[in-house]
Amino acid sequence: MQTIITLPIKARARAHRFYLDALGLEPVGEPGKDGIPEPLQFKLGTGVSLMLIPRTGFGWVLGDQPAAKAGLSECLLQCSCDEDGEVDEIFERAEKAGATMVLRPEKKSWGYTGSFTDPDGHLWVVTNAEPW
């Protein structure tokens, strides 16, 4: 089974550039006329991808239901790293690529963690978690 996480976006080019630069994700598919794959997808892992759909078409995908307002979410998107330095590197790249810092990386009881929002307001958590 293929799992696809789908998020609404405001601008394809901006979202494409952010996920390339901030998280170093690998695009899926052949580039279209604008140089960006259509649909805009990134490989997250074996059998898992991230699809980014313009907000104007997102409601259609939902069966003509309105998409939540930007910045409202009941979902955390999380990256798990092997070292604290890797967390810091992702935060540096994300900030340069246009992320808004929510919580800069710091040591918590469960590990080294921080969070940011992408340019469309989706919340990402990056963690080097303590072993369970």
Model-derived segments and spans:
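Hydrophobic pocket/interface hotspot
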Residues: A15, Y19, V87, A94
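Vicinal oxygen chelate
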Residues: Q2-K10, L40-L44, G63-W132
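Core segments of cupin and vicinal oxygen chelate
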Residues: L7-F58
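Short catalytic micro-motifs in class I SAM-dependent methyltransferases
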Residues: I4, L23, V125
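Short, basic, helix/turn surface patches
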Residues: R55-W60, N128-W132
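A residue-level signal for beta-strand positions that form part of recognition/binding surfaces
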Residues: S49, E74, L123
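A short, polar/proline- and glycine-enriched secondary-structure boundary/capping micro-motif
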Residues: V61-D64, A99
